């Protein structure tokens, strides 16, 4: 019975935030904080109950816990939620970043406190819904539902210095991209249901039953493309990434934390959970294309990041590069690479969130995000530059941080399958170090390039320090002791890989 509450708590909490705004500015913030804390506590409780440290995957049932309630029985649509190791990790990450998102917007947001927190909570509720839903219709419902609050978040509380027009443009761009891709996925879902109905005479949107749908190769390929396009826009895969830098550079800090940390992960999760098991043969045929697109994404993201002057746009492009690695891993079909992808997703969520929070704090102090205006900040502030250094080296995959474990496992697992692609993408890591260090150099070292950067600036408050140090500790823990994560996702990843590999062995020459 815990599962529906994981989704309901953020929705109810968001509604309360919106209604209690009249009692004072502080009330919505505290309600939001308590709400996200509860969600995080619930997800951790589920993790402790799951008994994931037993590594043999044979005896464990597929879902740790399920919730099934008929919704539109005539078409076989039900409110069907289930959780396994993979979705559990994602939900825990969502809860954690939710708490941080509330904390980092504590001082930043002045107008419409209640409505802001309503949108923030509803995004998080929608994301948790995406991770838990295994009814395809419900999945699509949550997938589209994340959009609207995110649109408001960017359009109403966007970047202060820019005039209203640009942030509304960015929000609209984000909305149109994701909406159009969602429609493609809706068509694919409906087509899949029709194919299943023609084969069996049963209307169902249930993921477990749709897994066994018999279909011809051409149909399967088309449906797989429908799903892939929807996930590729969210992930973002390179030709479809146009919304990401704009959305990030205009969104408030909390919005950026959610976008980078969680919304991008829904796409990778969708590919792993739905694309591969539902259309294994088509995915196997498509795999080389998918992997080359990932390689292209790594290099493109790195080069574009190097060229940016706006520090938030730079970080946005780093996440394009990071998700390129995940894309390569997803299409290798190797268990090791899948495990690496899960760790990479979590580590990237933490490190990108850290960078965006630091950006927000930097902006609150010097009121610019243009790196041409910074420089020489290292001696002007306590703590902040050094912590930026940590997150920058974490992003480029420094051993001892979680990002290294993820990237290493991805490259190691892919090497057995596609050595050429792996060797090429390893060079992407070199470019990663180039843009991270360039960012640090432009912002914190050298001469002060403007008036603002030359005076003494306030250090970090306790709240700011707490958020960042929490992320630092988690990243280092993940880097030195990733075993709990690996154990948790082991059986879920094993199932997905089983579906994928069995079909590959039968189709590939």
Where are these regions (language model features)?
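C-terminal ends of transmembrane helices
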Residues: 15-22, 98-110, 152-166, 235-249, ...
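Alpha-helical multi-pass transmembrane bundles of energy-transducing inner-membrane proteins
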Residues: 23-25, 118, 122, 126-215, ...
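Juxtamembrane/interfacial segments at transmembrane-helix boundaries in multi-pass membrane proteins
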Residues: 50-77, 163-171, 182-241, 271, ...
């Amino acid at each position: 019975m815990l599962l529906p509450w994981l989704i309901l708590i953020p929705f109810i909490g968001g509604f309360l935030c919106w209604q209690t705004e009249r009692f004072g500015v502080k009330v919505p913030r505290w309600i939001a904080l308590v709400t996200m804390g509860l969600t995080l506590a619930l997800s951790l409780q589920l993790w402790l109950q799951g008994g994931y440290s037993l590594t043999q995957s044979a005896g464990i049932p597929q879902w740790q816990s399920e919730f099934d309630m008929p919704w539109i029985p005539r078409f076989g649509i039900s409110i069907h939620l289930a959780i396994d190791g993979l979705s559990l990790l994602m939900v825990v990450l969502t809860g954690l970043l939710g708490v941080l998102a509330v904390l980092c917007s504590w001082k930043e947001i002045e107008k419409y406190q209640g409505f802001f927190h309503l949108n923030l909570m509803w995004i998080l509720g929608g994301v948790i819904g995406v991770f838990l839903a295994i009814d395809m219709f419900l999945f699509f419902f949550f997938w589209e539902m994340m959009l609207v609050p995110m649109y408001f978040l960017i359009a109403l509380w966007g970047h202060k210095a820019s005039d209203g027009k640009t942030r509304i443009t960015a929000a609209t761009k984000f909305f149109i991209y994701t909406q159009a891709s969602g429609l493609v996925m809706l068509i694919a879902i409906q087509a899949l249901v029709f194919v299943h109905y023609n084969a069996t005479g049963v209307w169902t949107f249930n993921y477990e039953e749709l897994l066994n749908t018999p279909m011809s190769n051409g149909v399967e390929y088309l449906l797989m493309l429908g799903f892939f396009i929807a996930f590729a826009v969210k992930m973002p895969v390179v030709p479809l990434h146009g919304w990401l830098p704009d959305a990030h550079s205009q969104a408030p800090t909390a919005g950026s934390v959610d976008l980078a940390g969680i919304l991008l992960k829904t796409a990778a999760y969708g590919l792993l959970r739905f694309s591969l098991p539902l259309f294994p043969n088509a995915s196997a045929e498509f795999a080389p294309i998918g992997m080359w697109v990932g390689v292209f994404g790594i290099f493109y993201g790195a080069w574009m990041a190097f060229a940016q002057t706006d520090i938030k746009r730079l970080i946005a492009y780093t996440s394009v590069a990071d998700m390129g690695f995940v894309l390569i891993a997803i299409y290798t079909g190797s268990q090791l690479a899948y495990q690496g992808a899960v760790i990479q997703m979590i580590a990237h969520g933490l490190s990108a969130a850290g960078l965006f929070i630091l950006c927000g704090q930097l902006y609150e102090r010097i009121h610019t995000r243009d790196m041409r205006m910074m420089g020489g900040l290292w001696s002007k502030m306590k703590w902040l530059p050094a912590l930026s250094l940590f997150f920058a080296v974490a992003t480029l995959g420094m051993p001892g941080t979680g990002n290294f474990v993820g990237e290493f496992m991805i490259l190691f697992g892919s090497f057995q399958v596609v050595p050429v692609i792996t060797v090429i993408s390893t060079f992407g890591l070199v470019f990663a170090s180039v843009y991270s260090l360039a960012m640090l150099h432009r912002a914190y070292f050298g001469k002060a390039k403007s008036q603002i950067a030359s005076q003494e600036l306030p250090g970090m408050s306790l709240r700011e320090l707490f958020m960042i140090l929490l992320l630092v500790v988690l990243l280092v823990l993940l880097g030195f002791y990733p075993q709990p994560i690996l154990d948790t996702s082991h059986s879920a990843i094993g199932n997905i890989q089983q579906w994928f590999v069995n079909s590959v062995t039968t189709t590939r020459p």
